[in-house]
Structure formats: C-alpha cells, structure tokens
Design a protein with these regions (language model features):
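Substrate-binding/catalytic cleft of secreted carbohydrate-active enzymes
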Residues: 1-139
Length: 139
C-alpha cells in the first residue's frame, strides 16, 4: 500500500496503481502544521473550513473512480478540530465504502483508522493492549 503525500499527485500515478493493483491511500492537499498546533491550529478556525472542505471535495471528485484507492486521508499534520470533523462527516456522507483516516485525529471519532506517525515499538504495544480498540493501526 502506498500513501500519496498531501499534494496532488500526477494522474498517471493513479493509472499505474489501478493497472498494477497497488493499493493507495489518497490524501487531501492539507498540511498546515507550520501555522501552529493546539489553539492556533487552522483545524480549529472555522475561517478555514471552506478551504479544508474544498480540498477534500476536490480530492474525492478527482479520484473517486480509481479502484486502487482503498482509504481516503483528510490531510497531514494540520492539527485536529472542527474543520476536520466537518470534512470527515461530508466525506462519509458521500462515500461509505472506503475508510477515512486522519493522523491527527488520533482516537477521536473523525478517523476510521488509528494511523499515528512516528510511533515507537512501545507505543504500538501500548495501543494493542487497550481493551476498547476497534480501529486498525497503520503506521
């Protein structure tokens, strides 16, 4: 499985993945960690909701007919908040056959997969012994 980086990928890449059976995580063009985390995150500022929604919508419309895509990703390292909750809700309303992941959602509702980056072996072991896990873990 390959994860597209949070920038639009060349259309030929999608064709190659479809043709040769490579599974793909397609990722919305959202990365704003340079603007801050926590309260300063653009994910929590509804002024940026339209931009988040537009980029998620464009990803979906561009890629929805590619069979190689098995997971949608809402973006990369952009904090978590109302903007990602709304984009998750929208994406699940139009597409309910493929899971949606968002790394910064951690264990919040707006991700179907626990997909934390840069985890240690101890972090993985700690997740696996939790009693209430119901999401797959992908690095």
């Amino acid at each position: 499985m390959v994860r597209n980086s949070h920038y639009p990928t060349h259309p030929y890449w999608y064709q190659l993945c479809d043709r040769y059976g490579l599974y793909m995580i397609d990722e919305a063009n959202i990365e704003s960690h340079g603007m801050g985390y926590g309260a300063a995150s653009l994910a929590k500022d509804t002024t940026w909701l339209t931009a988040h929604m537009d980029r998620t919508h464009r990803m979906y419309e561009r890629s929805k007919n590619h069979p190689a895509i098995v997971i949608w990703s809402l973006g990369n390292e952009a904090g978590n908040g109302i903007n990602f909750e709304r984009t998750y809700d929208w994406l699940k309303s139009v597409e309910n056959t493929r899971p949606v992941q968002y790394e910064r959602a951690e264990l919040n509702y707006n991700t179907d997969i626990y997909c934390r980056m840069y985890r240690s072996v101890d972090d993985i072991k700690a997740y696996l012994v939790k009693k209430d896990i119901y999401r797959p873990f992908i690095l």
